[in-house]
A protein has these predicted regions:
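Catalytic-core regions of core metabolic enzymes
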Residues: 1-640
Length: 640
């Protein structure tokens, strides 16, 4: 006969770790053809330089892609001096990557051709999918099913493309003509237009990128996949994200928490307001999450949140060039008082400390600074300070052990050679300590055009900003990230005495009886007891006499609170009366609550009152749970 066997599969830490490793390795292998292709087919390549297909081919050639290029166009024999092919099937050699810019109706055949020719990765530039409504979403679902059915991966649709600045690859598989300098930062953007702006800004600011991906509608490859690739990419030290939505927030949290332990992740989240969320939904067909949920997600996973793209770049420059601060003590060295005041204010507003230096350190500074200089911190060298004063001041402070980070504020007066000052800053920091170097950020002001000073500092990997608040903001966020990284991983405790099944039965019974809503006071007491959470004695009283009797039983002084499944904020309707010393006070409290509800025509909302003894000591807490449509259950926990 048949035998039925039931196996209980319990996840262990080791099992979960092995599963995550397999997922990571498989994801990295599947994304490699996007970033390290030996050959690229441009499907929809065109002789028209203004068309998307023409721009794609031009960008690949302008970047000097090191592999083979195959333009695909059924109506051309050659394009820009390259032999063209009528279809991907007609290409004589294997193509690792296909960049596709054809009308949506033509995509199914192109995907079949790519699969037949062994293409492993697709970048679909074409728009007209989930971002345009239900019909487009159905079209996107069919496209994704086809791509996955053939075992391929896809970036897009509705995207700008991607690039890799590795000198051995030099891939610009996008329709952006901008190829930024090579560097240690990788970025994923959910907006193609913002991607264009980011690439332009990166080139202007000399911000080196390792790779860039415009994910578009994220039908297949998402930021979650890219995080895993960049986690192991030796050319990537900092990860930048522009997010409008989270396809799978729990997976993002799991991956980001692990990656952020090794490499900083800086994210700008679009759609913070109702208007922004509506715009995000129509832009890439994505369900935008509530900002409170996003803030909690980033904070718990170590993701550094930037409020603007400008802030994203400011953080990126510092994280890519400087060590993380070991603490929150900041030393400010300046030649002007006003900027130092603004900087110090922003430091303290961001949770940083601007401590007064010790008498010993102040005496060392006084030995070479004029009597009018400020020595306490900020250190004001005054306007006449030269490069040597900056060098000596930084040497003393860096070696004092009284600062975890340095901010240098310089207002140009025209008399100081910019390059000499830049070198003095470098030398002062380097000669000040034999320990690990302190992070140093510079604000350089007062010049119409960028001079050799900021350029020299950038060459020395010392970030330069235009306004004094910016380095303070950057340090406050990098210090918070350093604190997060220093925290222990923690563990989930195993509670073996909880009767959670009883709690679930109580909740199901309440829903079956009355539908969705708030649990009654009696049911809530039972649920908390099932979870082994201690509850103060007392109970529900439906009448004034019951309330008086219950108060005698639990002992005075007592608290009387409205019991209601519909009134959530009891204090707003006078539903909480505290520190009642006798029976008469309890009766008056019952009447007061009842009469207030009657005055508001809400007497039917009163189920009675809860009577409990007053307690002292401990900490009053508030715990709440809500169900976010995207994130699932969210817990609010804090002071009551």
């Amino acid at each position: 006969g048949d035998m039925e066997v039931e196996l209980s599969l319990l996840s262990t830490a080791a099992g979960v770790e092995r599963s995550e490793l397999r997922e990571r390795l498989a994801t990295i292998a599947s994304l490699r053809p996007f970033f390290q292709p030996r050959s690229v087919a441009v499907v929809g390549a065109s002789r028209d330089p203004a068309s998307i297909g023409g721009r794609l081919l031009a960008a690949l050639r302008a970047a000097s892609f090191t592999g083979a290029l195959y333009p695909v166009n059924p109506n051309a024999q050659d394009i820009a001096g390259l032999r063209a092919y009528p279809s991907v099937r007609a290409i004589p050699d294997p193509a690792d990557l296909a960049v596709i810019a054809v009308p949506p109706h033509a995509l199914p055949v192109v995907v079949e051709d790519c699969a037949a020719r062994g293409v492993r990765a697709l970048v679909v530039i074409t728009a007209g999918f989930a971002e345009v409504g239900a019909e487009g979403r159905a079209r996107q679902d069919r496209l994704l099913a086809s791509v996955r059915g053939y075992g391929m991966r896809m970036v897009g649709p509705n995207c700008l493309g991607l690039l890799n600045t590795d000198p051995s690859v030099r891939l610009n598989a996008s329709f952006s003509p901008i190829f930024p300098p090579a560097g240690c930062m990788a970025m994923a953007s959910q907006s193609g237009a913002l991607g264009l702006a980011v690439l332009a800004a990166a080139k202007r600011l000399h911000l080196g990128l390792s790779t860039f991906v415009s994910v578009g509608n994220k039908a297949d490859v998402s930021s979650n996949d890219l995080l895993q690739y960049w986690e192991e990419d030796p050319r990537t030290d900092v990860i930048l994200l522009y997010q409008e939505s989270f396809g799978n927030p729990r997976r993002f949290a799991r991956i980001a928490r692990r990656v952020a332990r090794r490499k900083p992740i800086v994210a700008v989240k679009g759609g913070r307001t109702g208007a922004g969320r509506r715009a995000a939904g129509s832009h890439t067909a994505a369900l935008a999450a509530s900002d409170a949920a996003v803030e909690a997600l980033f904070r718990q996973t170590g993701v550094i949140r930037a409020d603007t793209l400008e802030e994203l770049f400011a953080l990126a420059v510092a994280l890519g060039a400087q060590p993380l601060p070991k603490g929150r003590r900041v030393a400010i060295v300046t030649n002007a008082g006003g900027p130092a005041i603004l900087c110090a204010d922003r430091c303290e507003a961001g949770g940083l400390l601007v401590p007064t230096f010790s008498e010993r350190t102040q005496a060392q500074l006084a030995s070479f600074l004029p009597p009018t200089a400020g020595l306490a911190n900020p250190v004001d060298l005054i306007a006449s300070a030269g490069a040597e004063e900056f060098r000596q001041a930084l040497r003393v402070i860096a070696g004092s052990g009284e600062a975890d980070a340095l901010i240098v504020l310089y207002v140009s007066a025209g008399a100081l050679d910019p390059q000499s000052l830049a070198l003095a800053i470098r030398d002062g920091i380097a000669s000040g300590t034999d320990q690990a170097p302190l992070p140093v950020l510079v604000c350089w002001m007062g010049e119409e055009e960028q001079t050799s000073g900021p350029n020299e500092l950038a060459r020395l990997n010392i970030p330069v900003y235009e306004f004094p608040e910016t380095p303070a903001l950057v340090l406050s966020k990098t210090a918070a990230y350093a604190d997060w990284r220093a925290q222990p991983l923690g563990m989930i405790p195993d509670f073996d005495d909880l009767d959670l099944e009883q709690a679930r039965r109580l909740c199901r019974r309440a829903v079956d009886a009355r539908g969705a809503g708030w649990l009654s006071a009696e049911a809530m007491r039972e649920v908390l007891t099932s979870a082994r959470l201690p509850v103060a004695p007392g109970g529900l009283a439906r009448t004034m006499d019951d309330a008086a009797s219950l108060a005698r039983r639990v002992g005075f002084p007592v608290a009387v609170k409205l019991a209601s499944r519909t009134v959530v904020h009891k204090t707003e309707v006078g539903g909480v009366v505290l520190n009642l010393q006798d029976v008469d006070a309890v009766r008056r409290a019952f009447a007061q609550i009842r009469d207030r509800l009657a005055l508001d025509n809400r007497l039917e909302a009163m189920d009675g009152v809860i009577v409990q003894p007053m307690v002292s000591g401990g900490v009053e807490l508030m715990v709440g749970v809500t169900h976010d449509p995207l994130f699932g259950p969210l817990i609010a926990f804090g002071l009551g």
